[in-house]
Amino acid sequence: MLETITAVNQAVNSFIWGIPAMVCIIGVGLLLSVRTGFLQLRKFPYAIKTTIGRIFRKKDASDGAMTPFQAVCTALAATVGTGNIAGVAGAIAIGGPGAVFWMWCSALLGMCTKFSEVTLAVHFREQNKNGELVGGPMYYIKNGLGSRWQFLAVLYSLFGVLTVFGTGNATQVNTIVTAIDSALLAYGSSLNSILPTVNLVVGVVVAMMVAMVLLGGVKRIGSVTEKLVPFMALFYVVLALGVVVINYRRFPAVLASIVGGAFDPRAFTGGAIGSIFLSMQKGVSRGIFSNEAGLGTGSIAHACADTRKPVKQGMFGIFEVFADTIVICTLTAMVILCSGVPVGYGSAAGAELTISGFTATYGGWSSIFTAVALCSFAFSTIIGWGLYGSRCIEFLFHTDKVVGPFLVVYSFVSILGATVDLGLLWSIADTFNGLMSIPNLMALLLLSGTVAKLTKEFFAGEGAGK
């Protein structure tokens, strides 16, 4: 029975996270780009001006809401995770340096996809009985497509709830304990005997911290993420830029390998990778599944923003993809390629390859800093996905009374993630994560006209100037 479940899950997982999903996500992104006149390119300066340009402006949100900046920080908290460190390394190892080029290409379309998701989420959101703003794919399906499409909203929420415990929590906690264990073992193998106890303590501490943040509601979530996300992003960017600066002589050759390797991977991998398609597949998939454009999850956080202008909040969606993929994922690639560490093209690789890039440049002591970065990324992901799960279960049961018990269970899973190996369950959760894209992409396809209309009205009226 267990073997059958494993086989079925692997088959579905390969399909959902494989070529069909990429084609659908890219296709919808291209359609949305055409219908908005490639807004992500035409209005990119405006997007930066209305996002980064307003970060330091103090603004208080109304009760039950976040400021627009808190909303994007919460979305980034869930998006910028360990995949930015481990996933990029895997893409380069299997797809070669050229995978980075295709990652950039997918991000350009992903910007418009996420812009559309955020715009629709704010436009079709509701206010629950506690006065909190709630929205996301399930709400723009319900309010934008009508009752006959309600089943898609239910499916999205169901897949979301089934995803959060594994993808959003347990795998992230496992990354935290792995990073801490590695840092401890760097000081001597004699510490190996205390690792089980350390893992349990870490799991309990993480569970308590997660519960304290999530049970405080959207105001506390926003307050935490607006402080944590900029810190962890800046910390990682500075650390990675240092690697590039120290190894600046390698930068021109690295850039050439990224562009050239996209079209002739064999020439830059010693013949280990000879397929342009493989390079494209790995780069595009990393871009898509790093910034989550097409999954719709980030729009759940953006729907909490205290704003009356859906399109203006949508600009944060463009910024989010830019920050996640163009900045952070690219810097991870530069750490690996500029440091000169052996990549081992054609073989699987993960966070250890990125860590090797840092240690090759800074020395062994940098393992402490990479552990801090990994822990920060993982913890922020747990917080972001906790919000997503609470919104999904609230939609399924039509009441917020289930949210509290759900968050208690969600927090407890952190202990299991730190101490127990439940690989199959987390693999199934990863499959459900991919399944979330199906109802969301269908909704984006059917509501593409609404996105185009809202965008045109916004930039034609006074809204764009305010």
Q: Where would I find each of the regions flagged by the language model?
A:
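Extracellular/periplasmic helix-exit of transmembrane alpha-helices
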Residues: 117-129, 241-257, 265-271, 304-307, ...
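Helix-loop-helix module between adjacent transmembrane segments
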Residues: 31-33, 106-131, 138, 142-174, ...
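Alpha-helical membrane segments and immediately flanking helix-loop junctions
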Residues: 59-94, 120-144, 155-161, 273-322
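N-terminal alpha-helical transmembrane segments of multi-pass membrane transport
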Residues: 1-82, 92-99, 110, 411, ...
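Transmembrane helix-loop junctions in multi-pass membrane proteins
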Residues: 4-5, 35-40, 83-88, 166-176, ...
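Selective recognition of specific alpha-helical transmembrane segments in multi-pass small-molecule
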Residues: 109-117, 203-218, 229-249, 285-286, ...
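Flexible loop linkers connecting adjacent transmembrane helices
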Residues: 38-66, 90-100, 104, 112-147, ...
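Membrane-interface loop-to-helix entry segments
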Residues: 24-32, 36-48, 173-180, 197-247, ...
